[in-house]
């Protein structure tokens, strides 16, 4: 995996491009918001490229049954790897330029809304929001937003101290 400092760009929820220079921290989180493992890569590395190594590291450290991911991870290699590890992949469908599939997903959402049910994707989003909260807490409360060191090793060390403090804090919250 690339570890050089570079520029990462993605589209936000409103369709605008957002760019940043540096690195990207990929975190695998258990229930309760406890980080299991983390990988620091170049900012331009797509999340799906890190999913397989991250899942293998996590499966070596803890035993779990489900791999819950969003539609960015909807590729056959990740589904296959998840099954090989003995997990059940719960990955949202990404229609990717398939108009028929996109229309079918829209119709399903409409039917669920009319009946008063939530779609499976909406329910899984609530589970995935745990990871988003961990990322937000790492940035806001544990020094992940402003990193004043240079180099992969130093940035990784800085962020791992934040992960360590976050893990200890989450475990104290669960105990008390």
Please identify what each model-predicted range represents:
Residues 1-84:
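Polybasic low-complexity intrinsically disordered regions
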Residues 42, 96-97, 153:
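Residue-level detector of flexible, active-site-proximal loop/helix-junction positions
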Residues 50, 130, 134, 160:
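Catalytic-loop motifs flanking and including active-site residues across diverse enzymes
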Residues 146-176:
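Charge-patterned, long linear interaction tracts outside catalytic cores
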